[in-house]
Amino acid sequence: GYEVIDTIK
């Protein structure tokens, strides 16, 4: 998705 948003999800 974005930057850390992919990491959080």
Swiss-Prot record:
Cofactor entry: heme b; Ca(2+)
Catalytic activities: 2 a phenolic donor + H2O2 = 2 a phenolic radical donor + 2 H2O
Coiled coil: none
Keyword Isomerase: no
Gene Ontology molecular function, alphabetical: lactoperoxidase activity; metal ion binding
Subcellular location: Secreted
EC number: 1.11.1.7
Disulfide bridge positions per record: none
Keywords of the record: Calcium, Heme, Hydrogen peroxide, Iron, Metal-binding, Oxidoreductase, Peroxidase, Secreted
EC class: oxidoreductase
Function as written in the Swiss-Prot or TrEMBL entry: Removal of H(2)O(2), oxidation of toxic reductants, biosynthesis and degradation of lignin, suberization, auxin catabolism, response to environmental stresses such as wounding, pathogen attack and oxidative stress. These functions might be dependent on each isozyme/isoform in each plant tissue.
Family: Belongs to the peroxidase family. Classical plant (class III) peroxidase subfamily.
Official protein name in the record: Peroxidase 6
Organism from which the protein derives: Capsicum annuum
